[in-house]
């Protein structure tokens, strides 16, 4: 079999498209909320397709998994930076949210790699029950991730407009009410991510030290 070009696998090509759409979104964020949010959500929507393509074409790779996670983290972080500019009074909240998201996923990924997992989504079934559900139930994973991204996207749109009226309430405001609990739950799971990964790393350190004695 000739050498395969991992960088040109279909899921990775989708990943590159996600990055392009995200950059277009960031470019339009200061001036064109509907255009920016459309490209941002399109980038997020493609996240579901690259996973399906990887499984259907047997093209799952470590590079693809890393690309996927980094795109997710960087996209959310850039949106939160913009929100901090639009809502300066809530800057601390956005800073904490960014830090928690990046730190929890990075430490969880690193601990998974050190333990020998091929992906941060490969969960030891004897581990944390919340993370087990989060990573083994695709509906739960999709709902939490999509709801979290939609919350921040709606918060961005809400700065410019209430949105079309549904009765006497703007659509964007209504969407914020619905997605806020999901975003809060996602943040709590990030805390669990961080604590569980820290405990895993500490256990690995303890095991290594025991071997040296």
Swiss-Prot record:
It catalyses: a CDP-1,2-diacyl-sn-glycerol + myo-inositol = a 1,2-diacyl-sn-glycero-3-phospho-(1D-myo-inositol) + CMP + H(+). Residues 1-5, 49-73, 117-139, 196-213 are cytoplasmic. InterPro entries: CDP-OH_P_trans, CDP-OH_PTrfase_TM_dom, CDP_ALCOHOL_P_TRANSF_CS, CDP_diag_ino_3_P_euk. Inhibited by PtdIns (product inhibition), phosphatidylinositol phosphate, and nucleoside di- and tri-phosphates. Disulfide bonds: none annotated. GO terms for biological process: CDP-diacylglycerol metabolic process; phosphatidylinositol biosynthetic process. Mg(2+) 1 binds at residues 47, 50, 68. The active site is at residue 72. Detected in placenta (at protein level). Widely expressed. Higher expression in adult liver and skeletal muscle, slightly lower levels seen in pancreas, kidney, lung, placenta, brain, heart, leukocyte, colon, small intestine, ovary, testis, prostate, thymus and spleen. In fetus, expressed in kidney, liver, lung and brain. GO terms for cellular component: endoplasmic reticulum membrane; Golgi apparatus; membrane; plasma membrane. It is a multi-pass membrane protein. Its EC number is 2.7.8.11. The keyword Ribonucleoprotein does not apply. One of its GO terms (molecular function) is manganese ion binding. The chain crosses the membrane at residues 6-26, 28-48, 74-94, 96-116, 140-160, 175-195. Optimum pH is 9.0. It is found in: Endoplasmic reticulum membrane; Cell membrane. Keywords: Cell membrane, Endoplasmic reticulum, Lipid biosynthesis, Lipid metabolism, Magnesium, Manganese, Membrane, Metal-binding, Phospholipid biosynthesis, Phospholipid metabolism, Transferase, Transmembrane, Transmembrane helix. Mg(2+) 2 binds at residues 47, 68, 72. Its cofactor is Mn(2+); Mg(2+). Optimum temperature is 50 degrees Celsius. Residues 27, 95, 161-174 are lumenal. Belongs to the CDP-alcohol phosphatidyltransferase class-I family. Catalyzes the biosynthesis of phosphatidylinositol (PtdIns) as well as PtdIns:inositol exchange reaction. May thus act to reduce an excessive cellular PtdIns content. The exchange activity is due to the reverse reaction of PtdIns synthase and is dependent on CMP, which is tightly bound to the enzyme. This is CDP-diacylglycerol--inositol 3-phosphatidyltransferase. The gene is CDIPT.
């Amino acid at each position: 079999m000739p050498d395969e070009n991992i960088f040109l696998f279909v899921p990775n090509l989708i990943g590159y498209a996600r990055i392009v759409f995200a950059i277009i979104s960031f470019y339009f964020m200061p001036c064109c909320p509907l255009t920016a949010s459309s490209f941002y959500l399109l980038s997020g929507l493609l996240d579901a397709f690259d996973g399906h393509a990887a499984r259907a074409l047997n093209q799952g790779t470590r590079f693809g998994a890393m690309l996927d996670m980094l795109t997710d983290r960087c996209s959310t972080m850039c949106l939160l930076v913009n929100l901090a500019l639009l809502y300066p009074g809530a800057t601390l909240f956005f800073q904490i949210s960014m830090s928690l998201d990046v730190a929890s996923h990075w430490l969880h990924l690193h601990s998974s790699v050190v333990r020998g997992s091929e992906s941060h989504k490969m969960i030891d079934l004897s581990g944390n029950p919340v993370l087990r559900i989060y990573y083994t139930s695709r509906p739960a994973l999709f709902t939490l991730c999509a709801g979290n991204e939609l919350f921040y996207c709606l918060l961005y749109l809400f700065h410019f407009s209430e949105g079309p009226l549904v009765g006497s309430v703007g659509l964007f405001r209504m969407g914020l009410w619905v997605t806020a609990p999901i975003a809060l739950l996602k943040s709590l799971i990030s805390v669990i991510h961080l604590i569980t990964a820290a405990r895993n790393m500490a256990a690995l350190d303890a095991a290594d030290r025991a071997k040296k004695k």
